């Protein structure tokens, strides 16, 4: 079968690989759609970050080259021995976290903080940029009736956003800022609306993405290339209760902090390619808080329920659909060159 595999920086190859077979406790899926994620783009431009290269990942037991793709959905085609609660033909979304189940974080149920954290399609395993995938049954979530396959491919990134907002201290009626209106930033805007934020101020240089943010319910969308974003946010709010950093751009982190009020909170959502710095006194003198957030835990059912209510709409977020053979040029390179894109979905080969 065809699969898109990471061999190195700017080296994604579509090649033939063996079709996977499910072992006991595993599920085989005919992939439908897979989204290209910001994390995939980081691996393409500056990897390896999550991709194991020197030695096999302790849970996937794989190393590069690996089949990419972790934002995916499809249809169950085969069940390994012992799998219950699923049936052939079920439409499913995949929660792609590798977790050991034995470290202190896993014992607390915080499997996204596992000492050996990994992701199908980043750390090995049968990623979604392929015709078929095989994953452990615990990663498989049956989709509600009426949810489209394109919508299913957005469950994973929407889970990132919803987890970040849940982890924050935002309360109904509070104010928020979102720095960066890529796919995750826009999904954070939607999650903030669900949480009852009274004002949501988005900072984003792309005009198309700013308009998307407004369409999704942002109060304002600020162009940082022509406006002092921090000053504008502080003028409107006196400082927001919570700011979300969703750019991975070093100079933006201190802006997020300075956009918050006293005792404000900054959530760092991005995966970073380089170091960032800030003046600690900006945190100390206002008793502000910094909070990291990674992936999600126990939120897939909530995300899919919200989708049935019209939230996290694929129609509003997907800007391009491509074939797997075009993944490098029309997918990764397009995301680098054209900041008007939000979410690009890759259709699985037959």
Give the ranges of each region predicted by the language model.
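N-terminal Rossmann-fold NAD(P) dinucleotide-binding loop
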Residues: 185-186
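NAD(P)H dinucleotide-binding glycine-rich loop of Rossmann-like/cofactor-binding domains
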Residues: 56-70, 98-179
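Rossmann-fold NAD(P)-binding glycine/threonine-rich loop
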Residues: 270-286
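Adenosine-nucleotide cofactor-binding segment
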Residues: 175-181, 193-255
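Glycine-rich beta-strand-centered segment in the early N-terminal region that forms part
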Residues: 20-34, 49-104, 144-146
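C-terminal hydrophobic helical "lid"/dimerization subdomain
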Residues: 250, 254-258, 297-350
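Glycine-centered, small-residue-biased loops immediately flanking beta-strands
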Residues: 174, 264-265
